[in-house]
Amino acid sequence: MKVFLIGANGQIGQRLVSLFQDNPDHSIRAMVRKEEQKASLEAAGAEAVLANLEGSPEEIAAAAKGCDAIIFTAGSGGSTGYDKTLLVDLDGAAKAIEAAAIAGIKRFIMVSALQAHNRENWNEALKPYYVAKHYADKILEASGLTYTIIRPGGLRNEPGTGTVSAAKDLERGFISRDDVAKTVIASLDEKNTENRAFDLTEGDTPIAEALKKL
């Protein structure tokens, strides 16, 4: 399967590029905003193409054409204002979803945020971020694409364990970025994740088994 990765320079995106390098079943095309970002991704075994989430859906669709699935891990990051959260986490995601339809790509995996579907559990200090994730997820669910929405808990940089908790509702928890990336790739091949959204935290269940039990 040829996978189009949006957010390849982010922390989860970089882990995905590394994991795809050793995966014989999938190849990766990574979207970047700047020409100088291409070299490191190509050195890691990815095809790299230029496109911008603040551009048009048609621009993104042209970059993604010929791929079989889109993985969206992009985010504005904690150092930017909520204007960028709106432009990247919400509008950028909406454009990527529209681009999938334009390019004829049916499979779409979104990395969202724990409890983004449940307003009662949003962190007050991060409410605009949760609003963006909530409505981006809603747009994907209504798109007609075959979607998977993964809502990870607080992200950590410790090495992954390969074991997780995955369920429709997990009120709090943390997870290694390694294990988020591994769950994304496992979801590509696990039919039971299709048209599902789930929370993801640390746990004791091997990733493949956790996805089968959703």
UniProtKB/Swiss-Prot annotation:
Enzyme class, broadest EC rank: lyase
Entry EC number(s): 4.-.-.-
GO molecular function: lyase activity
Stated induction or repression of this protein's expression: By high salinity.
The organism's place on the tree of life at top rank: Bacteria
Keywords: Lyase
Keyword Lyase: yes
Record-linked Gene3D superfamilies: NAD(P)-binding Rossmann-like Domain
Membrane spanning residue stretches: none
Active-site feature positions: 129 (proton acceptor)
Family indicated by similarity: Belongs to the NAD(P)-dependent epimerase/dehydratase family.
Name of the molecule in the record: Uncharacterized sugar epimerase YhfK
Species of origin: Bacillus subtilis (strain 168)
